[in-house]
């Protein structure tokens, strides 16, 4: 994938998103969509992620992150597109 077509988005997800398999499901979905980056729980009960891929891949991942797995209850998703020199090789749960 050309760097010119690579997008990076930083995401914070709020709601009932810890203890419901959100990160594990996010990794599975990321692999299905072909995006790279990472996802982790934060001490305040939110989930943080960085998603990298084409605009279409990133948009599809953001759409999924807004819903999450069946047990999750996403209340809010904040995302910010950013420029990042680092290129991730895969999508990991931190």
Swiss-Prot record:
Domain Acylphosphatase-like: 8-94
Highest taxon, organism lineage: Bacteria
Active site positions, chain numbering: 23, 41
Record-level Gene Ontology MF annotations: acylphosphatase activity
Catalytic EC class: hydrolase
EC number assigned by the record: 3.6.1.7
Hydrolase is among the record's keywords: yes
InterPro entries associated with the record: Acylphosphatase (IPR020456), Acylphosphatase-like_dom (IPR001792), Acylphosphatase-like_dom_sf (IPR036046), Acylphosphatase_CS (IPR017968)
Family annotation (PROSITE patterns): ACYLPHOSPHATASE_2, ACYLPHOSPHATASE_3
Alphabetically ordered keywords of this record: Hydrolase
Catalytic activity: an acyl phosphate + H2O = a carboxylate + phosphate + H(+)
PANTHER family for this protein: ACYLPHOSPHATASE
Family: Belongs to the acylphosphatase family.
Protein name per Swiss-Prot or TrEMBL: Acylphosphatase
Organism annotation: Bordetella parapertussis (strain 12822 / ATCC BAA-587 / NCTC 13253)
């Amino acid at each position: 994938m050309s760097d010119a077509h690579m997008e990076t988005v930083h995401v914070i997800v709020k709601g009932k998103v810890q203890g419901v398999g959100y990160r594990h499901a996010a990794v599975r979905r990321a692999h299905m969509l072909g995006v790279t980056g990472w996802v982790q729980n934060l001490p305040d009960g939110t989930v943080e992620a960085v998603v990298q891929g084409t605009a279409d891949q990133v948009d599809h991942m953001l759409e999924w992150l807004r819903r999450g797995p069946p047990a999750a209850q996403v209340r809010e998703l904040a995302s910010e597109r950013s420029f990042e020199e680092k290129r991730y090789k895969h999508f990991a749960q931190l």
